[in-house]
Amino acid sequence: MKHSFSRLFGLGDKEEEAEIAEHDTNKEEIQEIPVGDIIPNRFQPRTIFSEEKIKELAATIHTHGIIQPIVVRKTEREGQYELIAGERRWRAVQTLDWEKVPAIIKDFSDTETASVALIENLQREELSSIEEAHAYARLLELHDLTQEALAQRLGKGQSTIANKLRLLKLPEEVQEAILKKEISERHARALIPLKQPDLQVKLLHEVIEKSLNVKQTEDRVVKMLEQDKRKPKPKRKAYSRDARIAMNTIRQSLSMVEDSGVKLNTEEEEFEEYIQFTIRIPK
């Protein structure tokens, strides 16, 4: 199914399709551009490219040529172009030592360029779960959307978007492990109930060292949570009803903000006479 950008993300009246892989090249002027004059898309959500798949693509291109031109835009530097879509094809022709590559030149803004790169990769379904989560978060930010609205535009369930975004709350070390395929997405999601980053990282190391499967990881999480419950809790001064309502309202509001894709750094401290919430929002 094809969706115009204007309908999907309100990017104006351009006839560009969100599904870049199916450009109608009959309406576009294809030009031969020097391979060395092209730079990667700075908004590319994919951080890892399989060398083996690039070689396979290069072999196909060597035999059949490039059926689908890459898409680029001009940069401020004279004679230089930035990729919008087709980075795997661009990488493949570099291994073939091609001097020029067929391309379509678009006059896209940063927002349009980022959106095309994100949507193209999401539709190909080759991103890692972390790359996919970052892509969703970026689209939410670029277009000021709710998770529900983004899910509707991408034809996905809201729970799918929410589950991916929750992965971004995990420590960087856990996210790196997903990218490197040291653990699966299900392993990572099993760590989320632990809440504390140090415990999540500790269990991550155990999962990798002992090659725990998802069920074993979930069982370890349950045991760690039970151990935490058994620890003696310091006596606290009782809260008034108004204080409890205020605290719950703040926590719910923070949760809603984080579920929208904004990564907050929050601290909750209890003092003798008051509760202090510290919220840091990255710029």
Swiss-Prot record:
It is found in: Cytoplasm, Nucleoid. This is Nucleoid occlusion protein. HAMAP family: ParB_Noc. NCBIfam families: nucleoid_noc (TIGR04285), parB_part (TIGR00180). Its main location: cytoplasm. PANTHER family: CHROMOSOME-PARTITIONING PROTEIN PARB-RELATED, NUCLEOID OCCLUSION PROTEIN. InterPro entries: Chromosome_partition/occlusion (IPR050336), HTH_ParB/Spo0J (IPR041468), Nucleoid_occlusion_protein (IPR023705), ParB/RepB/Spo0J (IPR004437), ParB/Sulfiredoxin_dom (IPR003115), ParB/Sulfiredoxin_sf (IPR036086). Keywords: Cell cycle, Cell division, Cytoplasm, DNA-binding, Septation. Residues 148-167 bind DNA. One of its GO terms (biological process) is positive regulation of sporulation resulting in formation of a cellular spore. Effects nucleoid occlusion by binding relatively nonspecifically to DNA and preventing the assembly of the division machinery in the vicinity of the nucleoid, especially under conditions that disturb the cell cycle. It helps to coordinate cell division and chromosome segregation by preventing the formation of the Z ring through the nucleoid, which would cause chromosome breakage. One of its GO terms (molecular function) is DNA binding. One of its GO terms (cellular component) is cytoplasm. Pfam families: HTH_ParB, ParBc. The gene is noc.
